[in-house]
Amino acid sequence: MQYPLISEYVKAIQDGSDNLDKLAYLTPVLDNHGEPYRSSGAFAVVFKMLDKRTGKYYALKCFTEEQEGRADAYRQIADELDMVDSSYITSVKYMEKELFVDSQCEEDEFPVLLMDWVEGETMEAYISANYHNQSAMSMLCYRFGKMAAWLRSQSFAHGDVKPDNIIIRPDGYLTLVDYDGMFVSSMKGCKSPTIGTKDFSHPLRTMDDFDETIDDFSLASIALSLKAISMKSTLLDIYGASDRLLFSENDY
């Protein structure tokens, strides 16, 4: 299936009340330039939406690339997360043919993923701004450790734990986002859609490694980096980079 360009999605979201089906009550939040507020990644663009009736904000994810089995996977993920009551995770809802987009594609109706909007900044951005603050980094190290312990006790796994996929909320607590590579118990025996991000993944991880333990190495690597940085911030200046912490794939 071919998907629209980000620019085509932007035009569709600008008139969301006309182009959305069941979610027509949502309106886009605009940035300082009057454009729909958004962030984009390799396979999708995410818009910040507002339900004016309740004042609640949502994240609306629109896909730009095909991913085999995505619809079925997200239905299973949604079912699993619907039973989870934790601030570390947000609920998701996959909706087929929800958004009409005038594009060059053969199709004109496309799926979306609806999630609660998590206010805050990525852990990557937070560390960049605060790594010289020993108190802030020590608290982050503690809170990450609590989240890691919770995640390892669950029957599911995130699949791509890294600082850019963790939001630090204004109250300082953490929430995992981006569930494209998530494992849930109903997927046992399936292949993983991803092997995670190289600088945070076990070097021997393959598509066949897909169970509730796939986050263990990433969690350990990040926890070790955070502890070291909290004790000696200059380590990040020496060994770090903009898209990772102290370790790269060449270190494993």
Pin down the residues of each PLM region:
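Juxta-kinase regulatory segment immediately upstream of eukaryotic protein kinase catalytic domains
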Residues: 1-37, 72-74
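Conserved structural core of kinase catalytic domains
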Residues: 89-138
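Catalytic-loop of the protein kinase fold
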Residues: 148, 152-164, 168-169
